[in-house]
Amino acid sequence: MTRNRRKSKTTATSHPELHLEKVDPMKTVTESMILFDVQLQEWVTKSAKNHEFVLSDKGIPASAYFLLGSFCSDGDIHVAYASKCPVHSSALEENATESSKMLEDEWMSDHAERLLRMLPGGIHVVGIAWFSDKKTFSDRKSHIHKTLGRIQKMNNQITTANVDDSISDNMITVFFETPSTTPIGAIIDVTNRGNDSAQKVQFQKLEWISLVTNASARIVHNVPVDTGRPTDFYSDLVVATKNFVNNLFQCEFTLLDGEIRDDKEPLIKDIKKNKKTTIEAQLFLNPLYNRELGAIDDIASNMHEVLFDIEVRAAVPIRSTVKDAIRAIKHHLVRNLFARVELHYESMEVVEEERSPKTGITVHQLPRPATTVLYTHPAILINDFLFEADNVEDAQKNFDDMMDLQTSIEHVDEGWERALTPEEMEAVRTPIEDLHFVDFDGSSDSWCTTKTILITIALIIGLLASIIYFTVAHS
């Protein structure tokens, strides 16, 4: 929930030469690997057949899937699930043009962003699987790489608010030259002109583990208003929460199951003997992160107050380090918050809450979560976000539409939070509306007068204290 108030006063290389090199036995060189969960073998077979059908029936030249998984601590990329990118509805029409059947980069990245909002911390859109003939893949490769670049950029924005560089720059493509089901993998450096390097794809039994905590905060920040620029809800919220997000990623104090652990330690020390499915975490932030060295009188012309109490359910590969586990928790918190802010901001084009006539305060209630587990990996909890009039059936439909999860109602949990009642919304406003707000007039010196009166009162109290002290001392 956020609320903002106006007009209040506050204080405040290597060379390509042929040579022999002696290998240091203590030095190991590892390469990143693309690992698909073994359960995805069935998906590959099914998807290849499905593409052959739509190719012959509708003439659709390619099928694309978003690969959901994790950037593992050892550099490998683990894939847990694949979600189909739909084609535009016009591609299914009887006389559809060839151009309408193509998956454009903007169309794909828009759908990837919707997926990102649903994923827990530690799980990302790590790449794209592509089913087509070889020529189509070659012709569309630049568009695929462009899409991956957009996805990485969006992931940075929604998961770290662009204040931390912890999102990997490497993403993957996995090409299936149908009807073959043999994967051809490549790792793409999206920050280096999309350069790619071939990489073998392997199927293994993969496992993730849950990281659980709760996070609540009250963030108060005055967002400076630029003259001539209308205030923007989303941009203002990014500015208002920037210090908090910075502090979150700089935080070094975390307990995992009640222990302080070294960042470089493996999260699970003995995987073969491990029986844990969940690890509880506690993060400790610097409470003075929003304090400045000097205090000056200022006028808060665009004050924002952000309140949240969020249940965190992140997930990481079981072979992760402590550092990456803690990072996933932070990613979850930021992504969960900003996913709601983005959805709310988009909905404001339809519904805009009226500003309080008394104080100019607007209260924004962000959508609440509904969740379901990824059936192949129960540690991965998928999120949907519901508005006040939405219900569990809406969440079930969204899970099916976006990820083809086909989840039953019984497996959708919307009990994490609830919408505030009208009475509770009024109670949120009340503490602020009880204050006396006065429009600031730059030509007026009333605030200076108030300051002078306070100084005078302080001097009088000081004099009285001195008189009493000397009277008692000499009596």
From Swiss-Prot:
It is found in: Endoplasmic reticulum membrane; Golgi apparatus membrane; Cytoplasmic vesicle, Secretory vesicle membrane; Cell projection, Dendrite. It is a multi-pass membrane protein. Keywords: Cell projection, Chemotaxis, Cytoplasmic vesicle, Endoplasmic reticulum, Golgi apparatus, Membrane, Olfaction, Sensory transduction, Transmembrane, Transmembrane helix. One of its GO terms (cellular component) is axon. GO terms for biological process: chemosensory behavior; chemotaxis; olfactory behavior; protein localization; protein localization to non-motile cilium; receptor localization to non-motile cilium; response to odorant; sensory perception of smell. The chain crosses the membrane at residues 60-80, 453-473. InterPro entries: ODR-4-like (IPR029454). Expressed in the amphid head neurons AWA, AWC, AWB, ADF, ADL, ASG, ASH, ASI, ASJ, and ASK, and in the phasmid tail neurons, PHA and PHB. Disruption phenotype: Failure to localize the diacetyl receptor odr-10. Its main location: endoplasmic reticulum. Interacts with odr-8 and odr-10. Belongs to the ODR-4 family. PANTHER family: PROTEIN ODR-4 HOMOLOG. Required, with oct-8, for the localization of a subset of 7 transmembrane domain odorant receptors, including odr-10, to the cilia of olfactory neurons AWA and AWC. Regulates chemotaxis responses to benzaldehyde, diacetyl and 2,4,5-trimethylthiazole in AWA and AWC neurons. Plays a role in nociceptive neurons to mediate avoidance of high oxygen. This is Odorant response abnormal protein 4. It comes from Caenorhabditis elegans.
